[in-house]
């Protein structure tokens, strides 16, 4: 299995612990980030206390966990999106 924390570290340069993972439907993902995936997406969320940011790694569902996008949400609720 892909180590999801390693992907977050590679993309952000920070070692963060994933706190929760939730399943989202393609339509729900499209509403949030504007791009629609081909299948359901798992959203793995970590919190960066030093910057007060939520870091969300979006991957395909099990068993692949293929990285799809990284979303960093600042304390104002603004999203920075990087497609992977």
Curated annotation (Swiss-Prot):
The cross-references to InterPro entries, in alphabetical order and at most eight, read: Phage_PBS2_Ugi (IPR024062), Ugi (IPR043805)
Q: Which residues form a coiled coil?
A: none
**Looking at the Swiss-Prot or TrEMBL record, what is one Pfam family this protein matches?**
UDI
Q: Which gene encodes it?
A: UGI
What does the function comment of this entry state? This protein binds specifically and reversibly to the host uracil-DNA glycosylase, preventing removal of uracil residues from PBS2 DNA by the host uracil-excision repair system.
Naturally occurring in which organism (per UniProt)? Bacillus phage PBS2 (Bacteriophage PBS2)
What protein am I looking at? Answer: Uracil-DNA glycosylase inhibitor
């Amino acid at each position: 299995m892909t180590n999801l924390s390693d992907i977050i570290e590679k993309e952000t340069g920070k070692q963060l612990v994933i706190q929760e993972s939730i399943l989202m439907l393609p339509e729900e993902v499209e509403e949030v980030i504007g791009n629609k995936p081909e299948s359901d997406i798992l959203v793995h969320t970590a919190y960066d206390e030093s910057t007060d940011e939520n870091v969300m790694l979006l991957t395909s569902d099990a068993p692949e966990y293929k990285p799809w996008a990284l979303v960093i949400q600042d304390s104002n609720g603004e999203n920075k999106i990087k497609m992977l």
